[in-house]
Swiss-Prot record:
One of its GO terms (molecular function) is dynein intermediate chain binding. It is found in: Cell membrane; Synapse. Residues 46-60 have a biased composition (Basic and acidic residues). One of its GO terms (biological process) is regulation of postsynaptic membrane neurotransmitter receptor levels. This is DOMON domain-containing protein FRRS1L. Component of the outer core of AMPAR complex. AMPAR complex consists of an inner core made of 4 pore-forming GluA/GRIA proteins (GRIA1, GRIA2, GRIA3 and GRIA4) and 4 major auxiliary subunits arranged in a twofold symmetry. One of the two pairs of distinct binding sites is occupied either by CNIH2, CNIH3 or CACNG2, CACNG3. The other harbors CACNG2, CACNG3, CACNG4, CACNG8 or GSG1L. This inner core of AMPAR complex is complemented by outer core constituents binding directly to the GluA/GRIA proteins at sites distinct from the interaction sites of the inner core constituents. The gene is Frrs1l. PROSITE patterns: DOMON. Residues 119-234 form the DOMON domain. InterPro entries: DOMON_domain, FRRS1L. Residues 1-28 form the signal peptide. CDD domains: DOMON_SDR_2_like. Residues 29-60 are annotated as: Disordered. Expressed in the brain (at protein level). In embryos expression is evident in the ventral forebrain, but a lower level is seen in the remainder of the embryos. In the adult brain, expressed in the cortex, cerebellum, hippocampus and basal ganglia.
């Protein structure tokens, strides 16, 4: 037995060929995009097949594709609207004149017995915590305002105005009177603002702090002031001169802690209430009586 060469089993060459074939198959994996013409694409279509690239959609931007598909399928309704419509805005709560003199103070200017919807001008105020809530309404399509004055005259006054603009909105703005002109002040103390233009009337509601940092354009409402009442037209959302030459004002200073319901007749209803007219009537009556035989 010694001296004879060792023989390899017959199955060894076969095993080597199988191993080499397996290595070659791994180098040309079906998942490899670099496979040759005999390989297969990512969808299993042979690279050599006609129209292979056209049939397999490519996603160059996975995020962009996801976003567009998500938007198209999730947010577009059958009618083609991208988003559901927003819920309607709460309507403007009607001003309650029955609370005047009880839980809030009111000023009415116009026809006797008028209310917030029929007076030429209407103002109410009430305390809510550290704020004062104001409600204003006037027979105008422009603006309505209240001024806080120390002398019942225009000039150097703190003014809050509700202005109806060309877009149909009512905005609350802060002004400072310089003589007969109102200059808008960017520092606006108003909050919780709401307003509406209906039936040719501008109506609004807002709150303002009672105490504010010292500023010549903003007064402290815990002090008593004369209230100036004004309204007039607006051009492209900018206020113009008020409707009457001498706007009405409170007869005395107003305290926000005292609630009264004060009526002031407009000029059309002052004919027989002014002292001059009453004196004229008395004189005419006396003359007629004396002249009667």
């Amino acid at each position: 037995m010694a001296g004879q060469p060792l023989r390899r089993p017959a199955w060894v060459p076969l095993l080597l060929r199988l191993l080499l074939a397996g290595i070659a198959a791994c180098d040309a994996s079906p998942a490899d995009d670099s496979a040759g013409p005999g390989g297969r694409g990512p969808r299993g279509r042979a690279r050599g097949d006609a129209g292979a690239d056209e049939a397999v959609p490519r996603h160059d931007s996975s995020y962009g594709t996801f976003a567009s598909e998500f938007y198209d399928l999730r947010y577009l309704s059958e009618e083609g609207y991208p988003f559901p419509t927003a819920p309607p805005v709460d309507p403007f709560a009607k001003i309650k004149v029955e609370d005047c003199g009880r839980t809030k103070g009111c000023f009415r200017y116009g026809k006797p017995g008028c209310n917030a919807e029929t007076c030429d001008y209407f103002l109410s105020y009430r305390m809510i915590g550290a704020d004062v809530e104001f409600e204003l309404s006037a027979d105008t399509d422009g603006w309505v305002a209240v001024g806080f004055s120390s002398d019942k005259k225009m000039g150097g006054d703190d003014v809050m105005a509700c202005v109806h603009d060309d877009n149909g909105r009512v905005r609350i703005q802060h002004f400072y009177n310089v003589g007969q002109w109102a200059k808008e002040v960017q520092r606006n103390p108003a909050r919780d603002e709401e307003g509406v233009f209906e039936n040719n009337r501008v109506t609004c509601r807002f709150k303002r702090p009672v105490n504010v940092p010292r500023d010549e354009t903003i007064v402290d409402l815990h002090l008593s002031w004369y209230y100036l009442f004004a309204w007039g037209p607006a051009i492209q959302g900018a206020i113009t001169r008020h409707d009457i030459d001498s706007p009405p004002a409170s007869e005395r200073v107003v305290s926000i802690y005292k609630y009264e319901d004060i009526f002031m007749p407009s000029a059309a209803y002052q004919t027989f209430s002014s002292p001059f007219c009453l004196l004229l009537i008395v004189a005419l009556t006396f003359y007629l009586l004396m002249g009667t035989p």
